[in-house]
Structure formats: structure tokens, C-alpha cells
């Protein structure tokens, strides 16, 4: 099993979770102080980036995959525009990604490597009702859509 930690905004928090065994670190923002903490332990750091400059700097500091966040604000056009001058970039998008063919197709056609869909795959109502079948169906449907792209 691979277990990561998300929404990390500072180096001490990253270090704490790495000591507890996290296999990767994801952040909503790009904090250059987190990269060396993760690099020292050979643990991937996926920072949240909102500009081409942030993606470029994150790559220089060893981030193989950069998270574009918030995806619903930046949109697939941002990813397509970023990849034009930087085609080597591996992009994960989160924030507003929906488990629908139209939405996922837009992101993958733009060039993302992967997507994150937390709350859209785990709706609060389904979690509160402990409707694990509904959550399982949503996840399976999303994977089927991604496989078809």
C-alpha cells in the first residue's frame, strides 16, 4: 500500500508525516522549503502550482509531477498552454475535476498525466450515509472513463 499526505503547506509538517511513513507529499501551494525535505528521503513532492513560473521552479527543485490547483479556476487551457513550451512537464490537476467523460476528456486532451478527484468521488452525503456502494460505483465509473480515453 502507498500512503501519502495532502494539503501540506510547510516543511515541518512534511517532515512529521515523512517520519510517520508517508510515501509522497502533496501541497495546495508551492513551498520551496518542502522540496529538499522530501528529496533527502527520496519521497515525491507534488506542489500546487498556479503559474508556469511556479511549475518551472518546482521542476528545478526536483518535483517530477506538479499539481495544477485550483483546476476549475485555471482550466484545461492553462495545462495546454503550459505544455506548449514545456512538453516534458508531468501535470496532475485537482480542484473541480469531475468524474464525467466530458470533464476528464478535456483534462487528458490538454495533457495532464493524472487527476485528483477527492470530494467528487467521495460525496459528503454518501460518506455520511455510509453508502460505500455508491462510492465504489463512482470510482469504477471514473476509472472506466479514464481507460476509454
What are these regions (language model features)?
Residues 5-6, 93-97, 115-119:
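Glycine-rich beta-strand-to-loop/alpha-helix junction loops that act as flexible
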Residues 19-25, 40-46, 60-65, 85-90, ...:
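Glycine-enriched alpha-helix->loop->beta-strand junction motifs that scaffold or abut catalytic
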Residues 25-34, 68-75, 111-132:
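Glycine-rich phosphate-binding active-site loops on the catalytic face of alpha/beta enzymes
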Residues 38-43, 108, 124-149:
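C-terminal helical cap(s) of enzyme catalytic domains, especially alpha/beta-barrels
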Residues 51, 75, 135, 139:
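Aromatic/hydrophobic pocket-lining residues that form the small-molecule binding cavity
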Residues 73, 80, 88, 100, ...:
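Mobile acidic interaction elements
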Amino acid at each position: 500500500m502507498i500512503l501519502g499526505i495532502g494539503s501540506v503547506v510547510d516543511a515541518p509538517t512534511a517532515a512529521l508525516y515523512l517520519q510517520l511513513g508517508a510515501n509522497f507529499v502533496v501541497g495546495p501551494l508551492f513551498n520551496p522549503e518542502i522540496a529538499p525535505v522530501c528529496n533527502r528521503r527520496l519521497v515525491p513532492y507534488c506542489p500546487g502550482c498556479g503559474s508556469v513560473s511556479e511549475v518551472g521552479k518546482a521542476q528545478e527543485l526536483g518535483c517530477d509531477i506538479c499539481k495544477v490547483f485550483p483546476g476549475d479556476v485555471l482550466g484545461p487551457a492553462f495545462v495546454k498552454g503550459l505544455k506548449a513550451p514545456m512538453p516534458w512537464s508531468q501535470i496532475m490537476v485537482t480542484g473541480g475535476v469531475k468524474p464525467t467523460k466530458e470533464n476528464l476528456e478535456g483534462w487528458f486532451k490538454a495533457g495532464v498525466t493524472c487527476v485528483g478527484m477527492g470530494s467528487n468521488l467521495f460525496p459528503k452525503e454518501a460518506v455520511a450515509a455510509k453508502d460505500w456502494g455508491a462510492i465504489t460505483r463512482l470510482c469504477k465509473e471514473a476509472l472506466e472513463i479514464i481507460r476509454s480515453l
